Amino acid sequence: MQFKPALESATLLKRYKRFLADIEFDNGEVRTIHCANTGAMTGCATPGNKVWFSTSDNPKRKYPNSWELSETEQGHRICINTARANQLAVEAIENNVISELCGYDTLQTEVKYGNENSRIDILLSASDKPKCYIEVKSVTLLDETGSAGQGYFPDAVTTRGQKHLRELTEMAQNGSRAILLFTVLHSGIEKVSAAHHIDAKYSLLLKQAQDAGVEVLCYKAELSNTEMKLISAIDFIN
């Protein structure tokens, strides 16, 4: 995924009302931009940090600029735009970056499935193999006090994420292939674990899903102001 023109940078003043953030340029100009992330954004929205934003050419948008990246005091870059996770996953699958997901003929997105009225992020199909259901999650929470490079998901209690695990478990039990794909959108994260200390129920459901045959994949993104792409697998640690 390339950014043309390249992302512009400014300093974060504050994030508020979930969808908005105020930024300041070197010349003192203050601007309100859109924040495409309704989550906790733990460690991703510290006032004073550098941020990068894109600009839409849609004249109807009230806030044409969208917050894309943050940079921490340690120099780590984080993609905070949650929409990018699915886009990067689709791009990586189509370019055969994710070796575990090669060999399928058809890729569909947002397909209805399951008993809890869900939509799967990505559905892969081929005539010679079971359907492959892929739920994509972005990982941006770095543990800055414990093991070096340890990332966690989720960063807050997620009943929606719990539902997705139940749906994936059902798919695996019914003979389909079921994948939980963590897209790691924080340059400082080198391994991922379930955040039992944040959402114990999610952690338990994930273990049950794995026992039922759900596969867990983690792929890390390379992040810059001109391009984002998934580049390599990293470990998931139970």
UniProtKB/Swiss-Prot annotation:
Q: Which InterPro entries does the entry link to?
A: SfsA (IPR005224), SfsA_C (IPR040452), SfsA_N (IPR041465)
Annotated Gene3D superfamilies: 2.40.50.580, 3.40.1350.60
The Gene Ontology terms for molecular function here are: DNA binding
Family per similarity comment: Belongs to the SfsA family.
This protein is called Sugar fermentation stimulation protein homolog
**Natural source organism:** Vibrio parahaemolyticus serotype O3:K6 (strain RIMD 2210633)
Gene that codes for this?
sfsA
